[in-house]
Swiss-Prot record:
Entry's EC annotation: 3.4.19.12
Described purpose of this protein according to its UniProt entry: Hydrolase that can remove conjugated ubiquitin from proteins in vitro and may therefore play an important regulatory role at the level of protein turnover by preventing degradation. Inactive cysteine protease.
A single MF term (Gene Ontology): cysteine-type deubiquitinase activity
Domain of life: Eukaryota
Active site per the UniProt annotation: 109, 112 (nucleophile), 218
UniProt source species: Arabidopsis thaliana
PANTHER family assigned: OTU DOMAIN CONTAINING PROTEIN, OVARIAN TUMOR DOMAIN-CONTAINING DEUBIQUITINATING ENZYME 11
Keyword Hydrolase (UniProt): yes
Keywords tagged on the record: Hydrolase, Ubl conjugation pathway
Regions of compositional bias (Low complexity) in chain numbering: 10-35
Protein name, as recorded: OVARIAN TUMOR DOMAIN-containing deubiquitinating enzyme 11
Length: 245
């Protein structure tokens, strides 16, 4: 694996200089390249300059006693019926209360996983489309890492994941962990799996992202109780949900 793939943001400025010295095949492709480079530079700048985004591992210390199960990437399973979903939601709510955690609600528009990741990484859930774009890039560039977990033609899978509103899964979570060099921590509604850690391949994580995962249906962004009331933490009311809770 080369250096660019290990850290896709480290050479953002180098990529910008290279794109300026290479003639584009068309105006549209050149514009697309510039836009991609601008996105990369923005992401790199946000991650580098705002140490508060990492929250100094406070949630990690709070839940350090929990045992995490080994993570195996997978696509989404069958969605539960409303009765099972209700029970799962109650179980998740109880766990969050026990751990002293609160959810920042994400819109249920099919982008909730990417919104939650964007909120954790950039404190802006509206940056979800850029998170999705980089996750899809990771899936394409490092196909060998993920292909065995996808039970369909891989090109079809990546084309599907590129679309706005397509639900993320545990394969995209692994790709996000790898792309952003992050440990992704899930507090779940699973009866036998309350906590899952997703670590980047062959590298130490530089940051953490804490998400709640409810019943194969929905992801939210997690904070310690009381943090969401602070003035520097964004709050939002989701416009749409998949479930009436």
């Amino acid at each position: 694996m080369d250096e660019n793939h290990r850290n896709p943001f480290a050479n953002a400025s180098t990529s910008a200089r290279a794109s300026g010295s290479t003639s584009a095949s068309s105006n549209s492709s050149f514009s697309s390249s510039v836009a991609d480079t601008d996105d990369d530079q923005t992401i790199a700048r946000i991650l580098a300059e705002d140490e508060s985004l990492r929250r100094e591992g406070k949630l990690g210390k709070r839940l350090s006693h929990l045992d995490s199960i080994p993570h195996t990437p997978r696509v989404n399973r069958e969605i539960p019926d409303i009765n099972d979903a209700t029970l799962d939601h109650e179980l998740l709510s109880g766990r969050l209360a026990t751990y002293g955690l609160a959810e920042l609600q994400m819109e249920g528009d099919g982008n909730c996983q990417f919104r939650a990741l964007a909120d954790q990484l950039f404190r802006n859930a509206d940056y979800h489309k850029h998170v999705r774009k980089h996750v899809v890039k990771q899936l394409k560039q490092q196909r060998k890492l993920y292909e065995e977990y996808v039970p369909m033609k891989y090109r079809h899978y990546t084309r599907k994941m590129k679309k706005h509103g397509e639900w993320g899964d545990h394969v995209t979570l692994q790709a996000a962990a790898d792309r952003f060099e992050a440990k992704i921590c899930l507090v779940t509604s699973f009866r036998d799996q309350s906590y899952i850690e997703i670590l980047p391949h062959n590298k130490n994580p530089l940051r953490e992202a804490w998400l709640s995962f409810w019943s194969e249906v929905h992801y939210n962004s997690l904070y310690a109780n009381g943090v969401l009331a602070l003035p520097d933490v964004p709050t939002r009311k989701p416009r749409r949900k998949h479930w009436l809770f």
